[in-house]
């Protein structure tokens, strides 16, 4: 902020030009679940886990945490047969049914989209697995802006589908801390693929475990890919929705 109008405008123009010149450097590399499975197939024993972020379904960003997109894709690619995967989903009815069945029981559940019922994002799916754990999910967040906050998932259950463990919770909560899985007997450090539903805050604790972090290109309320959002009142052309436009400071 300056008192000289001409100098202030000149500096604003300089910054605008700099941002435009470097606009592509702000873009994050996004991965499909299929790409993650291929990379996991090449992973060597003893390598640190892959942490995959489904930021489109982040409760911290206003999403509901009940998307089954990543689960569906991992199963479709057969990852549950080859890789130790840890996933989470919010689904109170499914958590209750698994808890009622009890540890060791085989259950068939419909999971996903009990809170977000907009069909454009997805639909419930049926799974069959073995109940590994039931209980009340409570953990303390280790680091970042919510350090030492107690998170409560409500009634929860872990259902195993092959080598994949799905943590089904009653309530949405922050899922970007390894303590979420650890409080139900799952260890992220020993997994091949770990799902978090967090855009960035998860790095505070997960970067202590691994540098293999991947942001997914998934549909949802808070996607990493802005093109996945619908804007009805937007001037076109507009970056990044249009990438072939020319822009000048005086335009």
Language model features with spans:
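Hard-cation-handling environments
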Residues: 1-171
């Amino acid at each position: 902020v300056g008192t000289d109008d001409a100098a202030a405008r000149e500096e604003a123009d300089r910054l605008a030009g700099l941002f435009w010149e470097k606009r592509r450097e702000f873009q994050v590399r996004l991965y499909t679940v299929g790409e993650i499975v291929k990379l996991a197939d090449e992973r060597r024993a003893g390598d640190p886990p892959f942490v995959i972020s489904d930021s489109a379904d982040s409760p911290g960003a206003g999403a509901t945490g009940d998307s089954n997109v990543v689960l569906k894709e991992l199963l479709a690619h057969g990852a549950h047969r080859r890789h130790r995967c840890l996933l989470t989903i919010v689904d109170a009815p499914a958590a209750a049914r698994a808890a009622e069945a009890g540890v060791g029981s085989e259950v068939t559940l419909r999971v996903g989209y009990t809170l977000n019922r907009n069909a454009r994002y997805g639909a419930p799916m049926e799974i069959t697995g073995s109940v590994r754990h039931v209980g009340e999910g409570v953990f303390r967040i280790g680091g970042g802006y919510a350090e030492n906050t107690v998170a409560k998932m409500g009634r929860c259950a872990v259902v195993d589908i092959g080598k994949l463990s799905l943590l089904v919770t009653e309530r949405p909560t922050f899922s970007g801390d390894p303590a979420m899985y650890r409080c139900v007997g799952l260890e992220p450090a020993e997994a091949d693929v770990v799902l978090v539903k967090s855009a960035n805050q998860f790095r505070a604790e997960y970067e202590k475990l691994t540098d293999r972090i991947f942001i997914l290109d998934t549909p949802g309320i808070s996607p990493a890919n802005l093109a996945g959002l619908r804007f009805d009142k937007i001037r076109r052309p507009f970056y990044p929705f249009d990438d072939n436009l020319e822009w000048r400071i005086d335009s």
